[in-house]
Amino acid sequence: RRHILTIEDPIEFIFQHTENSIIHQREVKRDTNSFSVALRAALREDPDVIYIGEMRDLETIQLAITAAETGHLVLGTLHTSSAAKTVERIVDVFPADQQEQARLQVSTSLAGIMSQTLCKNTKGGRSLAYELMVNTPAIGNLIRANKVSERYSQVQLGSQHGMSTLE
């Protein structure tokens, strides 16, 4: 059985255990003081999957990267408008003298980034539009080299890897 741990603020949906998974949900302010405190505790529980409701600060982002580097599947949310900008947002949280190391860590631990938005549709409702960047060797090299515009071009050309842009 997979152990899934969520850290949320607030918990928006209560998940039930299944025969394949055990799900523990932690709510910031109710069960823990912060995302980073909950994430540090989560690493001691050895979950298979960690969902972080929002990666807001340096400590949470550092711990998320550490969790990914140690074999956990980490899913987290950031408020950004594209996959390329998500990488920049992660790296920019680090002090300038640590950003090169952060790019290296992200380039080796990242599986992919999905950026999503809701757009008005022709029926008056809203539809999901998304961008997907998969961390291929080329994307990893561009992350390490800090080549943002080239990463976007690689996403445009990466449909054989499942990548797509918002356009």
Model-derived features: positions:
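Short, flexible helix-loop junctions that flank or precede catalytic/ligand sites
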Residues: 1-167
